[in-house]
A protein has these predicted regions:
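Active-site neighborhood of HAD-like aspartate-dependent phosphohydrolases
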Residues: 1-51, 142, 150-152
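Conserved Lys-Pro-Asp/Glu-containing loop-to-beta segment of HAD-superfamily phosphomonoesterases
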Residues: 5, 108-135
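Short catalytic/ligand-binding loop motif for oxyanion handling, primarily in non-cytosolic enzymes
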Residues: 15-17, 23, 78, 85-89, ...
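Substrate-recognition element of Asp-dependent hydrolases with the DxDx(T/V) motif
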Residues: 58, 63-91, 97
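Active-site donor-binding segments of glycosyltransferases and PAPS-dependent sulfotransferases
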Residues: 87-119
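Acidic, Mg2+-coordinating phosphoryl-transfer loop and its flanking beta/alpha structural elements
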Residues: 126-159
Length: 165
């Protein structure tokens, strides 16, 4: 029997984009001000243009353990969009995945990374994503809105998939 496929977004799901950017701005306001859109003291997603930003991200709490648990019963793939204004984003994201999940052929995401701004074109059973953009809102399988009311964290996601088995 084939395992069901889960696509996992990176920014805001595996990697803590907003939290890391907020911390970097608080610690170094002069360094990031030029590349930052600030509204009421909070850094927003335009920060994806900061060179090297994706390599600085910390994992979302619980993400690493959850991925390892899910990989036992599901085929996992990263499905992430790339910012048009950051030419190094793809390389930084691949290096981030290697750092946290390993580089060898036994790594859970070895040759399982897809970059696309059309997530609705992916064929699979589940998509874990924090935003309804880049085609996520039209994904043909079940979408788990990470950080939302039903799936606020990785514990809630794991609970859902434990019921699905």
């Amino acid at each position: 029997m084939n395992k069901k496929i889960i696509y996992i977004d990176m920014d805001g799901v595996l990697a803590d984009f907003d939290g890391t950017v907020d911390q970097l701005f608080r610690e170094n306001p002069g360094k990031f001000r030029e590349n930052t859109k600030i509204v009421d003291g909070k850094a927003y997603r335009s920060n994806s243009s900061i060179p090297g930003i994706f390599g600085m991200l910390k994992p979302v709490a619980g993400a690493l353990d959850a991925v390892n648990k899910l990989s036992q019963n599901y085929d996992l793939f990263v499905l992430s969009s790339l910012p048009w204004g950051n030419a190094t984003a793809a390389q930084e994201k691949v290096l981030w995945l290697k750092r946290y999940f390993g580089e060898d052929e036994n790594s859970v995401f070895y040759k399982r990374i897809i970059f696309s701004s059309r997530k609705d074109l992916a064929i699979g059973d589940y998509l874990i994503d924090d935003r309804p953009t880049n085609g996520a809102e039209k994904f043909p399988g079940k979408v788990l809105r990470f950080g939302g009311e039903e799936f606020p964290d990785w514990r809630a996601v794991l609970d859902f998939f434990e019921r699905e088995i």
